[in-house]
Amino acid sequence: MYKRQATICHRAFAYAVDDIAVLAAGEDPMGHIRNQLADAINKLNNARLFSHLAGLFGTALGANKLDVAKAGARATEVNFLTASTIARARNLLGERGEDLDILIVHPTVAYYLYQVGMLTFSTSALSTGTNLTWGGGGVGISDRAVGEFAGCTVVVDSAVNTVAPSSSSGHQTEFFCYLTTSGTILEGQQSALRIEAERNILSKQDVLSVDYHTAYHVMGTKWNDAGDNPTNANLATANKWAITYDADLIPLVQLTVNTPLDTSTY
């Protein structure tokens, strides 16, 4: 009998500000650090999560990924994120594909959806349409956010490409996207976030120390390595993961796409 198993990651960092810096800045640098602390931790956690997902899809969840990116330059509509692409991704899970209701994308992909949503189509094909007008309907009329697409709530995060989909020379830049459901990706903590501060009178410094001990876990998967406290690079390593459910019972799909808003190549 297989058991699901998460791996705990221990993370910590510290900052120090000396009196000379305060005098030179004429402000409170430590105050600025405190104001940015929550955003900084979220950014670090997101990078860790997407490293985790890249590792899972390396081998263990290989059956649940769809790559429509062009193996070269000059990608076209078939290589972009479209409703058709979403349908193909749902199909990987069979009848359970209908459960997928969250779409996680890079901002560059999201702004392409925004661009397309501001068009009124008089033809059936984006690539061959000749009578397209801006501002006719869809998103962007009163709200710049891409709230939903193809039946999914859209979550935008630049950390999705923490692990690059490809680095093949001459390939147009590729982007990961993830389809999932609420409750598939879980977060647990071994101990709560701890923030400590003190004054070092010898060095004339204010010191701030932060540590947290948490785990991300995708239902139906397991950490398949004897070691614990992995780095992000270890989390992204394919052979360190396994699945304990059949792949189509795990509501998580990875897509790899291009976008016309970034035509740069590796």
Would you name each region that the model predicts?
Residues 4-62, 95-104, 109, 193, ...:
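Long, contiguous amphipathic alpha-helices that act as assembly "spine/axial" helices in icosahedral shell
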Residues 1:
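Active-site loops and adjacent core secondary-structure elements that bind or stabilize anionic groups
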Residues 92, 99, 188:
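Short, solvent-exposed cationic patches
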Residues 19-95, 240-265:
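Alpha-helical scaffold segments that mediate packing/assembly in large oligomeric complexes
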Residues 72-81, 115-266:
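Sequence/fold signature of self-assembling virion shell proteins
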